[in-house]
């Protein structure tokens, strides 16, 4: 009837007003993709295909009235569903957006498809559901409408006076039937688009990580901060994080932790004046002396970090003296062990070792005592000329504050304790510490000198099997001739002392190849053969060594029967 036809035209016109054309751009400003979608909220939120947004840094939007705007924030995205929800700056009137239907429609349902029309008038098409499948709990339809990439992203409408979006058109990538029947267009139930909501877990989504347009934070403050926290620790695209920080602080200006996060973020990117401004803001919004103390301590830490990586480009006031003044202010408000630890690190870096030791000892007397604080104290006391036994006691405490079996952070204290154990004459302790040390560091970092040193200590400690093994490893870890000789000579001699004839002979033969017919090599060959009962070879090699002037070989020769 004329009335029904008029109603259909009105519905189609409303649908057309909700459509959006979208152009995405890469970082160089080149067009990355062109697609279409539709508005679903009065604030300009739209639904569109995901694929054209992958890698895009910005997107332009235009509607059926040729008004232009920008995609502002990505709300949520799902690459598998090829759907994305985003906000724009094109606010809509009540007749310029479409509600989503939660329903799953059966085979035979008729939808209306309203694409853009060249003359601005709606050109509606009918599309019947000919097949349904399930995709993550949502109907996935095959339609009677012809398959066309140009239709992807368009809404399929319910047959109602005030139509709702029943499904979103998607290109059918399947194979055409063998009987020549053309492929029908596909569509995903609109209920899938309604699941695209921002939440804290989404911050780690690889689908969102692949997008470079800023992300919309959750409205709840706690959930939004969790989202921001995860972005700060997972995102490499600093522009995304900077926008998220700005959005969060605009919505929650008195959030102290986020303000400190922002200060750290900008300090790490060498924007020190911005970091200082944020730290000053954090001070203003800190509710008590303890939290203000933490801000001063944070500033000191940022200054020291910056001095390490960017000392040539810092503001004049970002210097070590200012960091110490910040710690003074922190301590005057509420002293913390962490502040004392940082003070000790700064003083140690200045060569003020006694003062550094005092600061570290303050930490060690607190519940915050740790491997680091005791190890730092040991280093400071050592540089200050402290007693060796006192240094070892601190190293013992450091290692007592690490889990057993030891983890990688115990490697440095173990190496230090081995040095002091050797100095104090406790070679056995030194060897055991170096055995633990070897387990904690990558094999590539352990060269021949390490094993030579441990072998010599093991020999002094009468840990002979360890010594032989370490001499063997030292020889295997180097191509340098002199180092191999340095390892094989004591190995062969020790094996002779241990009556390990086969090992002694193998080492002596390798030594002979490296230093042909030298007295040491010849003598060790003779002794090795003597151990194995090879009297003729023993006499021959010892005779050759004696002939070359080795008096000890001559004496040994007289004992060979």
What do these predicted ranges mean?
Residues 268, 305-309, 349-350, 383-384, ...:
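Register position in tetratricopeptide repeats
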Residues 3-39, 45-49, 58, 216, ...:
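N-terminal activation segment of mature serine protease catalytic domains
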Residues 257, 291-294, 336-338, 372, ...:
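Start-of-helix register in tetratricopeptide repeats
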